[in-house]
Amino acid sequence: LSALGAVVVKSLSPDPWAGNPSPRVHPVAAGMLNSVGLQNPGIDAWLDEELPALAATGARVVVSIWGQTAGDYGRVAKAIARASASANANANARGSANANASARASGSASGSASGRARAGASDPTTQTGRVPAAPPAPPARSIVAVEANVSCPNVEDRRRMFAHSCAATAAAIGEAAEALAGTGLPLWAKLSPNVTDLTEVAAAALAAGADGLTLINTLMGLALDPATGRPRLGGGGGGLSGPALHPVAVRAVFECRAALPDAAIVGVGGISTGEDAAELLAAGADAVQVGTATFADPRAPARILAELERWCGHNGITRLADLIGRAHE
């Protein structure tokens, strides 16, 4: 984990959500379809019950959030903001306590030394001050960013995906951005490729307060059992991910970088090798995420990072900055 930038958790909603019926995953050529349905315990339960174990590993955490209304994004973000503020307050209090303990320890040691000097001999019973070990940092201190997954049905717009509308995307991102104001946590908008012009939606997200873009979410797909005519997934259709999605992700990143040259972009989609990662970086991504590859290989992110380093060495690249956006030179 120390070699990775962060771990992105599954998307969290204001309240617990059961998700879709099984089967939820189906393999397809060069990837898979999934229809998990955003199952999660709800933001409060996750903060209390699951984040501590994740933080204990030393992981830096990106919290993915979703909602059924624009206001839901604000509710989840507010819970994160409260946890972050509480964690920072506790950290500041610990820092003050440790500073005071250090001062007391210093004073006690000096006083004891002076007493021994006056006595002309050391006193084995003299107590020197010790600084108590600092307690572990609050789990919420491990949160480094929030990612708003807007590829979700909007119940206020006939269940149309937020990410399929500039206005709906802006509304959801605006709610989250307002809730996170003052926390110092960057907000990323994770967008869908299932639109006519992704750059327009990306621009709307940035204008509404997103600090960066995560490109892209899955493509909508469907797998049928021809013998029965029934969908192979319990929820009907699903999202296509894996290597089959990679060229779509490269194009999305390339087009958004060209249209929005100052945007921070995280590229995701079908990365399974170091060269895949290099391709998204060359298209204009500032960083990348690895998802589906971890199903078959939980160590894929570390392996891909090592492969990327070797690829850069073989191609004479000494700084990733020289690779990022190379396709636009």
Task: State the predicted function of each range.
Residues 7-9, 61-63, 87-89, 146-148, ...:
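Hydrophobic faces of well-ordered beta-strands that scaffold small-molecule active sites
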Residues 73-82, 196-208, 258, 271-288:
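Catalytic cores of alpha/beta
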Residues 1-61, 66-71:
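N-terminal capping/small domains of soluble enzymes
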Residues 64-67, 191-197, 246, 263-275:
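Glycine-rich beta-to-alpha transition loops that act as phosphate-gripper elements at the mouths
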Residues 20-29, 224-237, 294-317:
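C-terminal helical cap(s) of enzyme catalytic domains, especially alpha/beta-barrels
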Residues 44, 48, 52-57, 165-187, ...:
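Alpha-helix-loop-beta-strand connector modules within alpha/beta enzyme cores
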